[in-house]
């Protein structure tokens, strides 16, 4: 029987906030968008279908700004307390609406090409880990498994997942970590805190940050306590080869050190942890490539808007409020 490891079947995140494998045609990015929007915003991006390649020259949407990023109102609420800061963020948004010149467009295309290479390696790595953590089990009445290798322990599965996929305790970050940071960066700009208005990146700073993540080799590579040179020294040959190919083709990147040394990237990671950005096609890249999606998903989508309910909250402490149907002005006040 097919018995997949539960650790690769379950992810945590906000299913409504994430980046996708969608792209813009380069000609749409050469001029400012209509109605003061950034380039390309008048036209929906095209999806790169599972198993297909990105069209030549097209640019991934999560490398580009959106006119709703860091969008706060100056009237009421936070606008009364931070009007000047919000005006600075508004000025930043206006700066994003100009078209890209030939040099910047070439940079975006090179970054998109780097994403393609990292995505292919991530998909291959995820597929291999899934195969190695799926145990064949005999079930009466079912066909014999093709292979009856001994099952791996949960500890070994966890170890493989956390080190090879999430690069925990490893100097060179996996393709997954690098891609996730880039996609998280795009999401984080929608939630950029007002009190961090002076750290929001200019267009050139954003491109430079993306180059550090995707192309690498900008920081020293000395080890620190508890870290390993690349990945497990006891790793299988295929995993070792993938790590060497990754360094040769996409440079050396330590995501954790990048985030420690860069205020912006550190804030991106903090916002990602807080809001739980979830990129479906990245989290299940091998499944999307193999079958285009899912036959069945189980979870708790955030369909219900979270609101404050005086009666419901206070009745947890004093049930009489709910039982007697007291209105707000009749609720007892406790010191």
Walk through the language-model features, giving the residues of each.
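SAM-dependent methyltransferase catalytic region
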Residues: 1-335
